[in-house]
Each structure stands twice: as C-alpha cells, then as structure tokens.
C-alpha cells in the first residue's frame, strides 16, 4: 500500500496565522470538500484542491461540519453555540442555537434529520419541523454517528460513555468504557458496509484504544491498543478499511477488525480529522497547523501463481487461494499485513512484517484446497521478491539471492552482476529445483537450489521483464524492456523469432510448440513458425495450460478458455495432420474436430481421422474407416476407391462417381445413384443394356416414388418392372379398385399368388363381385364358398353347394349359426339338419335356454325348451341307437318347457307392480306348478315365489284353509328379505279367517266326479281314479277331457277313420228339452225322465274298480270309436316314434282348441284372444297362418 499526495493546502487567516482544521465533510458525489477552519467554512474542489468559496456566518471557531446524504444541504457547528444549515449552492438558509458550543453534527442517512450536539444537550432538527427538539445529557458530547438505517444515533461522551438513542432521542443502550472519565470518547463511527448482518460501531477513546461494539452494546473482539490519542476515526465507503488520526501526527490505515496496516502521510502537528472520499481510495486529512492534504492510496497486487493455483492478498490481511480450473476458493486469515506471497506445488509461503508462514496442502488430491501450517520462520526480512520451493524459500534483495530452509537457516547465497528483474521456479526434484533468473543487464541464468554456481543460459542486449521456458526445456521466451517477445533455442542460443507488443509471455505446458503473449489489449497465440493469431484481451498472461490461458487483470485472475482452432487450421493447411491432432487435443470445438477428421480422411491419414471421429462420436465415419482398414488388410490398395467412398459419405456424389469410374467400379456408382434416387445420373452408368440392371433400376425408382408419396406412379413402375405383387399391394392399400381389376384381368390364371392377393384386396374393399370373379378365374371354389358365407350371400352359396355337395358343411353350418344368432331357430334347425349337425343344433339351443333362465326370461326359456324337446324327438327318429336317451330328453324338456311357461306368470306377479292375470288364473297356475315340481326345483324357479303367490290368491279367493297351510309351508323355507315382512304379516292375519275353503274353487275329476284337495300329494292326477288332469295352457283350469287308449290291433289311421264315420244317434241335447206353448207364453222344460236317457258306450268305459292304487286307463274298441263324434275327440298327432294321444270331451258345450304344433289345449275364447294379441301360439310361437294350416 502506498499513499501518493494529490494536493496539499495550508489554511491561514488574513493575518497569515495558521488556522486549525477541526472537521471535514465530503459532498456525497465526492466533487466538493467542506472544511471547518478557524471561524470560517471553506469549500474546496477535490479534483485539484482549489478553494471554491469561503463561507462566513459563524463568529467563533467552527468545530464540526456534516453533509446530508441526498447532497441537498450541509451543516456547520461552532463555538458561538450556533448551527447553520447551508444549501448545496453554498447559501445559508437556517440558523439555530444551543446553550453551549457545538461539538459535533451528523445527518440521518435516511430521513436527513440533523443531530447537533453541545456540551450539555443534543438537538434533532428536520426540514419538516419548525422547532428543534433538544435533550439534556449528563456529560459533554464529543462525537456522534447515525446507523445505516437511520434508526439509532450513537453519542460519544467525555466521561467515557457511549449512549445509543432512537430517532426520538430516547436512550436504548449505554456502553461504559473501562477507563471511565480517564478515557474520554473522542470519535465514533458506524461501519457503512451493507454486507454485514450486524451494525458495528468503531469507538476511539483517549485511553489510546480502538474498540468495536454491536448495536446491542456487546463488544466485538478485544480492544486494540493504538499508542496515541485518537482524534478521528473514519470508514471507507464499503467498510473494508478504517483510517485513524491523532496525536501521532499521521493517519494510520486499519482493517475493519482493527489490524494496523500502515501509515498515510506523516505531518508536523496533530491530525484532528481525516475522511475518505466516497466510493474511492482518496483520503483527506486536516491538521492543527492548518495543513489540508489529499492523498491517493494505491493498493499493490500481492500474489503468486503455480499452474492452476493462484494465491492473492485480500483486505490486506487475508490470503485467498483460487483453483483456476474448478473455481474453488479458500481464505486464509493472517490477521496481519500480508507483504509477499509465493506458491509452488503443494507449498504456500506468506510473508508478514515479523514472520514468514509456510503452508502445505492437507492431501495429495489435485483438487484439495485445505492448507495447514507446516513451518513458521519468526524473523523480519526485507526483500523485493519471494519464491518458495519444496524445502526452501528464496529471498531476492536487489542483486542478491538467498536460499533459506524452512527453519530460517541460510543455506546458500548467489550474487548477480545486475539487479534481478524476474525469478521463476521451473520445477525439478524436491530440494533440487531449478530457478530461472532474468537480470536488468539482459543476462538470463539458471540456478539450482542445491548448486552454488549459477549457469548462464544466454545474454541479450536489453533488460529482462518476463521469462518462461517451454515444456521440454528446449526453448526460452523472453519479454524485454522494449515490450518485444524473443524466443531462443537454448541449445544453440539462436534467436528463433521475435514479436512486438508483449508485456508478458507463457509457454503451453501441454504442447512444446505453442506459446502466448499479451500486450496492447491483445492476446497473441503462436504455434511453431506460423503467423501469430490475435484476439482482444485485457490484462497480463501469466500461464497457459492446454486450452486455458490464465490472465491477470488489475486484481482479478481469470482462466480464459481459448479454442485452439486457429493454430490447428494452420497445421491443416500444410497437411500436418498429426501435429494438428495434438493441437486439437488442447481444446477445440466439435466443429473443429469434425473438420480435422474430414481433412485427415481426405488426406487418407486414417489413424488421425479415426481418433478425431471418436472424439465427435461419429459412428458412420468410424464404420467407413473400419471397413477401409479391413479391405487394406485383405490387400485392397486402390486409394481412388477409398477416396471415392469418403466422397460418397461426405455427399460429394459426382466426385465419388468419377473416382469409382476411374477405379473401374461403375457398378458402385450405379448403386450409389440408385440408392440416392438420382435415377437420371444412374442411367449414365447402366452397362451394355443388361435387362436385369434395368429392371432393378426401375424397381428402385418405384420404391422411391412410393416413399415420396407418389404411389400411383410407383404402382405403374412396379408393373412395368414386372413386380406385380408390389403393384397389387400399393393399389390395394390405396383402394384403387380400377387398377386392381386391370391387373387381375391381365394376369394369367397360373399366377395364383398375385391373383389371390387381388381377391384379398377386393374382399377388403367390399367389391365381392370382383373377388368372386378372381376366385372363379383360378378355380378356387373353397375360397369362393368362404367368400359367399362371409358376405352372407346364401343363395349363391346354396347354388354352388348343389353343384358341389362336398362343400355342404362349409355353407350350412355357418348359415345355421347365422340363423341362430338372428333368432330364426326353426330355420337354423333345418340348416343344422341339412348339414347333419343335430348335436350342434341342440348345443346352441341349450345355451340359449340357459341364458334365458339366468336372465329371468322364463317365457323364452319355455319356448327354447320346447324347441329342444322337438329337436330331441327329431334325433330319436333318425338315430335308433340314441332313441331311448333322446325320448327321455324329449319328455324332460317338454316338462321343463311347461314349468317355465307357467313360472313366467308367477315371476311377473312377484317382481312387477301389476299383473294382467285374474286371481283365479294365478291361483290355478301356482297350484299346477306346485304339483309339477319335484324335490329339486329347476334353475331359476323359486318355490317361495310360487307358495307366496298361492297364499295371497287363496286368501283373496276365500280358500283360507289352503292359505294357512301354504303359509305354514313357507315357514320352513329361506325367505328373501323383500317378502319377509309380507309373509309374516300374512301368516298372522290368515288366522283371523275361518279354517275352511270356498267350495266353488274345489277341483273335480271329470272321469270319476271326485272332488280333489287343493294340495294333492299325487300331483296333477285324481286321487281317486288316478286319471291325469288336462289343463288349459292359459288359465290352467281343468278341462273336461279324458284321455283314452286304443285297443291292440287298431292303428291310428283306422281309429281316425272310425271316429270320422260318426254313426247317427239322437242328440241328447235335443232330447232333453221340451217346448210347450199356451197363449202368449213359450216354456222350455228340462225333463230327466227315463225316456230321455240314451246309452253312451264311452261312459261305460270310464268306470273302474274302486280302492285300487293303480291307474286303470280308458281303453276303447272299434264299436266305441264308431259312436264318438269327431268334434268331441281331440288327437295329439305326435310324429314317430311316439304314439298319437286321444282325448274325449265330456262337455261338448265347452269349446276347446288345440294347437296343432305343440298340442297344448286352450279354452277357445282364451286361445283366440292370445292369438290376436301375439299373432302366434302363446306356447310354441308358431305363426297363426302356419298353425291354422
């Protein structure tokens, strides 16, 4: 640190008497200086020290001045007890007084409130207030200072107390110095730094100590002993340094922690005041003898560099070591002035005023940044330069070099002929390092630490400023006093070249032939003997490692990444590929690597090209180089062919084609142009009209047309090249039916594969006629049948099957399945039958039936079971070996059909809100179903639902006894929760009814006229004669029908013919009524006289032996058959192998209708109504027209 005087002035009054300067203040922009001298306020221009104007207004000595932070006004305080406010235009605008002389003034940096302090009080004035608020104090105030945020004012007192007040003047903190009244506080100042978290107050007292306190009153660090009485303490603008002046007649520079760094401008009298110019390194001081001096402080750079580690001084007392590659930094706090720094490998030497510290790295890691103290030499040294080695330090003093061990013992000394201008460690074994020394007389020496003799390398005419030696120690670069860079060959001492405008030079540590030098605002890079490459760069080059150049600009060291492109291209121009590769390894861009690789490839230096392509990870070119190397191993040495491949890869196709031709490989040129779709150029290389090559070319041209989305052109080209399959695929994919038709008709029927492809696309495009035509052309009848089936063109399929019966299964089975899917079961059945697949028909129907039951479609289930039964009957007729099993299934399915048909009504009654059935019908249905159910109910049929329906209808119709019995039976079953309440309620309420049934409801047997119970253990047969009841299939009332059987020997045909004869007999109906007329009245009388009785042979056959448990059927002979009327006989004409069933109506007046397909009996009125509703039989769903036939 040096203090350079800028200007000095001596202040006198008119009588030439010296005027003491008690205070100074800078205008915030630094252009003006306000001086308190005698009883005047002087205003100076800081640039040259000229006085702008003296301000008069005070009548006595001016003790203090202060400038507002906004630069609009300043204040002065005097021994005349007054404070004057001045504007920046140097006009006085306000004056106010205290009771005692004014000791100090200070402006609030935020609110611009002015604090003025006297011996007995302090006042606070602001422009907004008319009056000044004053506060009494117990001791004389000597100094004051506001915090940065303007919230608190610190007052320094004569009794050794620091009082910290808020903006309103109230005391918040009181700091008492140990010396008390013997240590008056003479100057205080808050640190203006914005980086510190705490406000720090510097306190200087006349106990000759400098102390630091936080706002809370807590002391920071220990008291610093000054050795003189301090009169003024002041901070630099950023708070990094403090200046203190006083009785030692000089200004001293301290760190912000109070470490003394050195003196600034020694004077002849006490220095009462000192201030730092805002945001600069200028200091002004005011003395007792009227001296006003303005100094510039120059902080020299103290630093050291070794390869990528740079150490420099910070805040005068700290050393920062920076790793230039990783940008890591470490701070070493020395707490003393750092004078010199040296760094070498893992060693760091720091010289302080009274000692030298040697540090070493904590570990061997190249990126380690942890230093620890290795040795300490407690001795004062005076030296110009300091160098550190592995086990020694070297001190340079003018012409002398001294070598000391780390213990401080002098081991060796060298005396030079001239002043030493430059010294550098150039490496070597530990304890035997070499040093490069440059002298003022131009001599350059090499010194080894363990050798007392210096070796002269060379001597030049001009003085040395900078030196560096190349990596292999063969070349030496020197910068002389004329800023010329000279490069010598150390062996021959020859000057290799020289370059102007250099202030520093450095060889590349990784490349022998590269160096860089800086000067004139430019960075110059020189490779071998090539011209210098320049780029703009401010500062000094101090190191060059690979592609990084270490540059020192003012105080900061930076690593500049410099692409080595320019020198690399210089080598490339001369086809020096290997040297260019070495340069590229130092650091070039990917584009430069690619350029190097391409140039080397074209120069057929495959080794260099391969390395370069590996760098840019270009696999295509690496494959090419690999293939060329393989071919070379096989003895292929045609460089033209290799170069042609290279040009082809680079896209230089015409050059490649010429080289292929030159090498006699026209076919390669043809392949290349073909692959590139450059068909016009390819045609030039077609041989002597080889049709194979021509066809290949057209095919590839078509492929290209296809890829560029010109498919029609491509298809036409495929056709002309004979690639029919590709043309068909392209046409089919784009739906061009016209082109497909044209191709299919042109193709020969022997070309089966393309024709089948055409047919496939016709099918896909829904042009089935053309597909059929194509299949006919190739005679593929099976495919044609499949086409008809897939498109459901059944008529054409049947016509084809008639001519070709072997395809019967191919048509009828899919047809039957299609019919079944469309609920056309009868037709499906026929189709299955035609295909001979009765088992399939049964399986499909069984599945449909099961689904209907699961989905609670019981009506459909009944219908499907009836269909199944008829299917089984059909099978039993055709296959005798299965007859018994099928007949058994027939009866089972007939029974199930009847059960589901009945349960449909019960299900609807229990699960739907409304029922279309009468109570009597539901009553009959539920009884019928209950009697028909065996122990195990069929899937889906609920016994609870059946009993619940019967119970409700019994109660409604007056069959209370039956209802009670049914409710009791329900108690033994698991009842769903939805019925539980209703059933429990019904069970209770039925007990209020009489325990008997309505006689109207009791069923009667028409054979034996026996009344039957409602709940019959035998089922739907008479308990007396065991005759099976015949029910109406709609209302399930018992019909007046009795089944009879034919005597042995009477065939069905004969029986029908005998009944049809209908022998004449008197009508019992006509004979039983008598008509009588008398006067105006007509009377009909039913007369049951004996003469009315006629004999009926069938009635006699109804009798049976009472008390027998076996059923005795009614068997009739020919005579009885002759007596029967045809309209009284109903015949169920079952197909074989079943026998016909005969029924005789005992009440001819009751009209009964039987469905001719399912043979279910109905009351005629019910049947007609149901047929009108559904247009079919309600049981078997045969359309009415079909039924009537």
Swiss-Prot record:
Highest taxon, organism lineage: Eukaryota
GO biological process: cilium assembly; intraciliary retrograde transport; intraciliary transport; negative regulation of smoothened signaling pathway; protein localization to cilium
Annotated InterPro entries: Beta-prop_IFT122_1st, Beta-prop_IFT122_2nd, Ift122/121, TPR-like_helical_dom_sf, WD40/YVTN_repeat-like_dom_sf, WD40_repeat_dom_sf, WD40_rpt, Zn_ribbon_IFT122
Repeat found in the keyword field: yes
Predominant place of localization: other
WD repeat feature ranges: 16-54, 57-97, 99-135, 137-175, 180-223, 225-264, 266-306, 459-498
Gene3D superfamilies assigned: 1.25.40.470, YVTN repeat-like/Quinoprotein amine dehydrogenase (2.130.10.10)
Keywords: Cell projection, Cilium, Cilium biogenesis/degradation, Cytoplasm, Cytoskeleton, Developmental protein, Repeat, WD repeat
Subcellular location(s) of the protein: Cell projection, Cilium; Cytoplasm, Cytoskeleton, Cilium basal body
GO CC terms in record: ciliary basal body; cilium; cytoplasm; intraciliary transport particle A
Oligomer and partners: Component of the IFT complex A (IFT-A) complex.
Described purpose of this protein according to its UniProt entry: Required for cilia formation during embryonal development. Acts as a negative regulator of Shh signaling.
Name listed for the protein in its UniProt record: Intraflagellar transport protein 122 homolog
Organism of derivation: Xenopus tropicalis (Western clawed frog)
Species lineage: Eukaryota, Metazoa, Chordata, Craniata, Vertebrata
């Amino acid at each position: 640190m040096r203090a350079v005087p800028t200007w000095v002035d001596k202040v006198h009054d008119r009588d030439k008497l010296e005027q003491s300067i008690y205070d100074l203040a800078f205008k915030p922009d630094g252009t003006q200086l306000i001086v308190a001298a005698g009883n005047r306020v002087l205003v100076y221009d800081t640039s040259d020290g000229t006085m702008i104007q003296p301000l008069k207004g005070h009548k006595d000595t001016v003790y203090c001045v202060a400038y507002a932070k906004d630069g609009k006004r300043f204040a002065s305080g005097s021994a005349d007890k007054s404070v004057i406010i001045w504007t920046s235009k140097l006009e006085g605008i306000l004056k106010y007084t205290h009771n005692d002389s004014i000791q100090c003034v200070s402006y609030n940096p935020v609110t611009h409130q002015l604090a003025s302090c006297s011996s007995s009080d302090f006042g606070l004035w602001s422009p907004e207030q008319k009056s000044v608020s004053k506060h009494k104090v117990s001791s004389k105030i000597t100094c004051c200072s506001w915090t940065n945020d303007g919230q608190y004012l610190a007052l320094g007192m004569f009794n050794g107390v620091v009082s910290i007040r808020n903006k309103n003047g109230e005391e918040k903190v009181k700091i008492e110095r140990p010396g008390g009244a013997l240590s008056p506080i003479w100057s205080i100042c808050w640190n203006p730094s914005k980086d510190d978290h705490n406000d720090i107050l510097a306190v200087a007292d006349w106990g000759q100590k400098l102390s630091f306190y936080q706002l809370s009153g807590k002391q920071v660090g220990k008291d610093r002993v000054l050795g003189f009485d301090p009169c003024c303490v002041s901070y630099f603008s950023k708070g990094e340094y403090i200046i203190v002046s006083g009785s030692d007649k000089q200004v001293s520079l301290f760190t912000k922690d109070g470490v003394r760094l050195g003196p600034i401008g020694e004077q002849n009298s006490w220095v009462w005041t000192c201030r730092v110019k805002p945001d600069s390194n200028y200091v002004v001081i005011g003395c007792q003898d009227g001296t006003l001096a303005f100094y510039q402080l120059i902080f020299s750079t103290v630093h050291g560099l070794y390869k990528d580690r740079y150490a420099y001084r910070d805040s005068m007392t700290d050393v920062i070591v920076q790793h230039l590659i990783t940008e890591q930094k470490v701070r070493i706090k020395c707490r003393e002035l750092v004078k010199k720094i040296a760094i070498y490998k893992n060693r760091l030497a720091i010289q302080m005023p009274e000692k030298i510290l040697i540090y070493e790295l904590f570990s061997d890691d190249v990126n380690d940044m942890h230093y620890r103290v290795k040795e300490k030499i407690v001795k004062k040294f005076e030296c110009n330069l300091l160098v550190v080695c592995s086990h020694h330090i070297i001190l340079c003093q003018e012409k002398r070099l001294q070598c000391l061990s780390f213990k401080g013992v002098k081991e060796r000394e060298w005396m030079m002929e001239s002043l030493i201008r430059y010294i550098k460690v150039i490496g070597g074994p530990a304890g035997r390092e070499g040093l490069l020394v440059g002298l003022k007389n131009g001599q350059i020496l090499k010194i080894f630490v363990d050798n007392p003799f210096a070796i002269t390398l060379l001597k030049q005419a001009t003085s040395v400023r900078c030196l560096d030696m190349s990596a292999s120690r063969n070349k030496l670069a020197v910068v002389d006093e004329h800023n010329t860079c000279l490069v010598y060959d150390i062996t021959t001492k020859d000057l290799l070249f020289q370059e102007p405008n250099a202030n520093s030079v450095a060889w590349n540590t990784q490349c022998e032939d590269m160096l860089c030098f800086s000067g004139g605002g430019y960075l110059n890079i020189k490779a071998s003997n090539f011209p210098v490459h320049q780029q703009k760069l401010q500062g000094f080059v101090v190191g060059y490692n690979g592609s990084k150049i270490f540059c020192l600009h003012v105080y900061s060291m930076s690593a500049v990444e410099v692409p080595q492109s320019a020198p690399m291209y210089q080598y490339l121009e001369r086809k020096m590929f290997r040297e260019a590769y070495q340069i590229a390894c130092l650091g070039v861009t990917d584009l430069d690597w690619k350029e190097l690789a391409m140039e080397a490839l074209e120069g057929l230096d495959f080794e260099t090209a391969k390395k370069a392509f590996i760098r840019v990870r270009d696999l295509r070119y690496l494959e090419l180089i690999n293939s060329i190397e393989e071919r070379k191993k096989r003895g292929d040495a045609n460089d033209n062919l290799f170069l042609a491949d290279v040009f082809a890869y680079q896209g230089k196709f015409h050059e490649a084609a010429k080289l292929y031709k030159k090498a006699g490989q026209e076919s390669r040129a043809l392949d290349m142009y073909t692959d590139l779709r450059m068909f016009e150029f390819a045609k030039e290389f077609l041989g002597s009209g080889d049709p194979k090559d021509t066809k290949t070319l057209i095919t590839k041209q078509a492929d290209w047309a296809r890829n560029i989305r010109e498919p029609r052109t491509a298809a036409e080209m495929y056709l002309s090249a004979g690639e029919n399959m590709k043309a068909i695929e392209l046409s089919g994919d784009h739906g061009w039916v016209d082109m497909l038709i044209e191709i299919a008709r042109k193709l020969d029927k022997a070309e089966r594969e393309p024709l089948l492809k055409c047919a496939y696309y016709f099918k896909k495009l829904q042009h089935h006629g053309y597909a059929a035509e194509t299949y006919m052309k190739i005679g593929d009848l099976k495919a044609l049948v499949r086409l008809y089936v897939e498109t459901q063109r059944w008529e054409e399929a049947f016509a084809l099957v008639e001519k070709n019966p072997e395809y019967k299964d191919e048509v009828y089975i899919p047809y039957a399945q299609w019919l079944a899917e469309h609920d056309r079961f009868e037709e499906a059945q026929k189709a299955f039958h035609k295909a001979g697949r009765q088992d399939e028909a049964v399986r499909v129907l069984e599945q449909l039936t099961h689904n209907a039951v699961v989905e609670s479609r019981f009506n459909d289930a009944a219908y499907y079971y009836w269909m199944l039964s008829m299917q089984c009957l059909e099978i039993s007729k055709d296959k005798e070996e299965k007859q018994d099993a099928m007949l058994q299934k027939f009866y089972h399915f007939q029974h199930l059909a009847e059960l589901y048909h009945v349960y449909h009504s019960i299900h609807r009654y229990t699960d739907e809100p409304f029922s279309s059935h009468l109570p009597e019908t539901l009553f009959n249905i539920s009884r019928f179903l209950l009697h028909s159910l065996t122990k195990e109910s069929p899937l889906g049929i609920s016994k609870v639902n059946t009993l619940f329906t019967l119970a409700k209808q019994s109660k409604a119709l007056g069959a209370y006894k039956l209802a009670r019995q049914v409710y009791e039976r329900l108690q033994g079953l698991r009842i769903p929760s939805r019925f539980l309440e209703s059933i429990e309620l019904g069970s209770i309420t039925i007990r209020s009814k009489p325990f008997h049934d309505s006689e109207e409801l009791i069923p009667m047997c028409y054979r034996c006229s026996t009344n039957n119970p409602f709940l019959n253990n035998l089922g739907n047969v008479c308990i007396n004669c065991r005759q099976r009841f015949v029910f109406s299939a709609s209302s399930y009332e018992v019909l007046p029908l009795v089944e009879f059987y034919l005597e042995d020997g009477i065939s069905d045909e004969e029986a029908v013919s005998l009944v049809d004869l209908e022998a004449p007999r008197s009508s019992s109906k006509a004979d039983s009524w008598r008509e009588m007329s008398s006067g105006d009245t007509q009377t009909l009388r039913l007369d049951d006289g004996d003469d009315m009785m006629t004999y009926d042979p069938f009635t006699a056959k109804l009798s049976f032996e009472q008390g027998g448990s076996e059923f005795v059927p009614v068997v009739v002979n020919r005579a009885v058959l002759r007596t029967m009327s045809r309209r009284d006989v109903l015949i169920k004409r079952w197909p074989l192998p079943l026998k016909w069933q005969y029924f005789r109506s005992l009440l001819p007046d009751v009209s009964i209708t039987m469905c001719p397909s399912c043979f279910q009996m109905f009351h005629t009125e019910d049947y007609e109504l149901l047929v009108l509703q559904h247009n079919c039989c309600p049981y078997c769903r045969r359309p009415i027209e079909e039924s009537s036939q």
